[in-house]
Regions:
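Active-site rim helix/loop that mediates acceptor-substrate recognition in acyltransferases
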Residues: 36-57
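Acyl-donor (CoA/ACP) binding surface of acyl/acetyltransferases
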Residues: 1-33, 47, 57-165
């Protein structure tokens, strides 16, 4: 099992003990069955094994409060599949857990992991034009705005040499 810690959070890979939480949290558009959740978990575990130093394949971690380490409150990770040659940071928090600084803690710890543990050369991220909370997360994590998307969103980056732990 993989686990990263922040001040308030545990970011970790999920296990079969977390199937009920996957069912509860993977609720779009109409939810998933326990069997589908088992398939999701199997995919997460397969992807985790494919990550190598300098080459993230896909890392999806459950976000847990340290005070409630069994309840998933969000997802975060690093993706190397969607944009080949890039490592992309992602995060999403359950609505009840937003505006608490949790996404910023996730972003900072994932950047540390990408640069210090996985030797990535850079990490990218983006948000929609109306998602200013996510824009601020990337700013607070130290990422630099580099361009606008064709739909008016924002593209951010951080190079390894610019990372400060």
């Amino acid at each position: 099992m993989m686990e990263l810690l922040t001040r308030d959070l545990i970011l970790r890979s999920l296990t079969s003990d977390d199937l009920d939480e996957i069912v509860r949290m993977w609720n779009y558009p109409a939810g998933v069955t326990p069997e589908e959740a088992a398939g999701v978990l199997k995919g997460m575990q397969y992807n985790l094994k494919k990550n190598k130093s300098g080459a993230i394949y896909h890392l999806c971690l459950g976000v847990f409060e340290k005070s409630d380490p069994k309840r998933v409150i969000g997802w975060c990770g690093l993706d190397g599949i969607a944009a080949p040659g890039q490592t992309v940071l992602f995060y999403v928090m359950d609505e009840k857990y937003r505006c608490k600084g949790y996404a910023t803690q996730c972003a900072k710890e994932l950047l540390r992991y990408a640069f210090e543990d996985m030797d990535c050369s850079s990490v990218e991220s983006a948000c929609a034009k109306d998602n200013m909370a996510s824009y601020r997360v990337m700013e607070k994590a130290g990422m630099r705005l580099i361009s606008r998307t064709k739909h008016g969103g924002y593209n951010f980056t951080m190079a390894k040499e610019d990372f400060k732990s």
